[in-house]
């Protein structure tokens, strides 16, 4: 029983850390990375289609993304979708290849992005703490039903706290890497 609760809590905490990593990939750091455009969809045959399904996105160099569109007629739509996104990018089309130069980030914009990233990390920590609260509640319920002893309850809560500490530490490490990336000029 307790092992199942701990395993479930650990899996949910790991998913929270992964979700944070995925959210932070979408934050522009001034360095070209294909995941920067992962949230963009294109209207294709009447359906919203993710950009990576209608084009190949690669980092040409540290400041330029190259998008090779599979269907020539889509180039204009892809270009428009990138301009309409709130990323502040200006794509340049040359046939089936669209180049997206990334302008350097201003100091003010970097600081704003750091605030956003810290907020995302705090949301991740809150999610992990909520998972801890749920797991501890499940353990307390077992204690109340007299399925486990008070010693088992205390031990389980200590182990759940260790899982929580590890997840929060992981979140802090991810945050530190992203902040460093953002503040590099």
Curated annotation (Swiss-Prot):
It comes from the Bacteria. SUPFAM superfamilies: Ribosome recycling factor, RRF. GO terms for biological process: cytoplasmic translational termination. PANTHER family: MITOCHONDRIAL RIBOSOME RECYCLING FACTOR PSEUDO 1, RIBOSOME RECYCLING FACTOR. Belongs to the RRF family. NCBIfam families: frr. This is Ribosome-recycling factor. The gene is frr.
């Amino acid at each position: 029983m307790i092992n199942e609760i701990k395993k479930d809590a650990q899996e949910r905490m790991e998913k929270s850390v992964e979700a944070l990593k995925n959210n932070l990939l979408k934050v522009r750091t001034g360095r070209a990375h294909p995941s920067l455009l992962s949230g963009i969809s294109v209207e294709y045959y009447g359906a919203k289609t993710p950009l990576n399904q209608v084009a190949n996105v690669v980092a040409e160099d540290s400041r330029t993304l190259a998008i090779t569109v599979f269907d020539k007629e889509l180039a204009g739509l892809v270009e428009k979708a990138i301009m309409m996104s709130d990323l502040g990018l200006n794509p340049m089309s040359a046939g089936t290849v669209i180049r997206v130069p990334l302008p350097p980030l201003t100091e003010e914009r970097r600081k704003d992005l750091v605030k956003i990233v810290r907020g995302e990390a705090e949301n991740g920590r809150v999610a992990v703490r909520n998972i801890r609260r749920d797991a501890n509640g499940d353990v307390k319920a077992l204690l109340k039903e007299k399925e486990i002893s008070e010693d088992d309850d205390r031990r389980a809560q200590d182990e759940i706290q260790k899982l929580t500490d590890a997840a929060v530490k992981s979140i802090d490490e991810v945050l530190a890497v992203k902040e460093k990336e953002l503040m590099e000029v």
